UniProtKB/Swiss-Prot annotation:
Domain of life: Bacteria
Reactions accelerated catalytically: 2-dehydro-L-erythronate = 3-dehydro-L-erythronate; 2-dehydro-D-erythronate = 3-dehydro-D-erythronate
Encoding gene (name): otnI
Keywords: Carbohydrate metabolism, Isomerase, Magnesium, Metal-binding
Family in the record: Belongs to the hyi family. OtnI subfamily.
Name of protein: 2-oxo-tetronate isomerase
Enzyme Commission identifier(s): 5.3.1.35
Functional note: Catalyzes the isomerization of 2-oxo-tetronate to 3-oxo-tetronate.
Native organism: Pectobacterium atrosepticum (strain SCRI 1043 / ATCC BAA-672) (Erwinia carotovora subsp. atroseptica)
Gene3D superfamilies documented for this protein: Divalent-metal-dependent TIM barrel enzymes
Active site: E143, E240
GO MF annotation, one: hydroxypyruvate isomerase activity
């Protein structure tokens, strides 16, 4: 049975971030994810989780300088010290939040740059991250991003992610499959589920092409959820989509799995 996590970076955005924990719990979610925790002290976030009975299941390493076009620094050859400092900081947050998985962001490869150098830097930094997190039982995620959302990101295909995971070669490295990106880049989602079986550590969902609730568009999510059950996927599924309107009004698709408070 699927386990859904509310993505607090994209859902319940009609209230301030710290109020979204209660909004998610009131809507029936028992777990949450979001992009970046670093604006807030970890103890404050941990208290928000506790007081709302929520589990933190995922967050990302820091994105770098977004205004300058960065989206992660772990693949940037001239930012190795920054990348490892971000990884160390993420570990502190993961421990404080009792979070089982962290997504290490790669980075954008500017046109004309040596992609192989960026890839090797990413591999080296991911080995560093995996080795730092492993003693604590925390998994590291890597995620492919489509050019529609992030042009020139280090890798766009789920099969590139699989190749990188194999090259990194650490037991706590897993692939985070966002079906929004996977459908745009690869398609054939059922085959991806089977080809990556055992290597998928986290999943995210949204409709394609609009990136709204997963009850519209070209992906048959009830079929996808059933297929994930068939391969005994036991991880979380993050709801990383832009609601058509008020988040609560668009959760009808998830009612069979949510634990609404009355």
């Amino acid at each position: 049975m699927p386990k859904f996590a509310a993505n607090l970076s994209m859902l319940f955005t009609d209230v301030p971030f710290l109020d979204r924990f209660k909004a998610a719990a009131d809507a029936g979610f028992t777990s949450v994810e979001y992009l970046f925790p670093y604006e807030y002290p970890a103890p404050l976030l941990a208290e928000k989780l506790r007081e709302n009975g929520l589990k933190q299941v995922l967050f990302n390493t820091a994105p770098g300088n977004i205004a300058a076009g960065e989206w992660g620094v772990s693949a940037l050859p001239d930012r190795i010290e920054d990348a490892r400092r971000d990884i160390d900081n993420a570990l502190e947050y993961a421990l404080a939040l009792n979070c089982p998985s962290v997504l290490v962001m790669g980075g954008v490869v500017p046109p004309g740059e040596d992609r192989d150098a960026y890839q090797q830097t990413f591999i080296d930094n991911l080995r560093y991250a995996a080795d730092k997190f492993a003693p604590h039982g925390i998994n590291i995620m890597i995620e492919a991003l489509s050019a529609k959302v992030k042009p020139n990101y280090l890798f766009a295909s789920q099969y590139q992610a699989l190749e990188l995971a194999n090259l990194i070669d650490r037991p706590n490295i897993y692939i985070q499959v966002d079906f929004f990106h996977a459908q745009i880049v690869d398609g054939n989602l059922t085959q991806i589920i089977h080809d990556l079986d055992g290597r998928i550590g986290h999943i995210q969902i949204a409709s394609v092409p609009a990136r709204h609730e997963p009850d519209e568009g070209e992906i048959n999510y009830p079929f996808i959820f059933a297929e994930l059950d068939r391969v005994n996927y036991s991880g979380w599924i993050g709801c990383e989509y832009n609601p058509r309107g008020k988040t609560e009004d668009g959760l009808g698709w998830a009612e069979p799995w949510l634990e609404k408070k009355h």
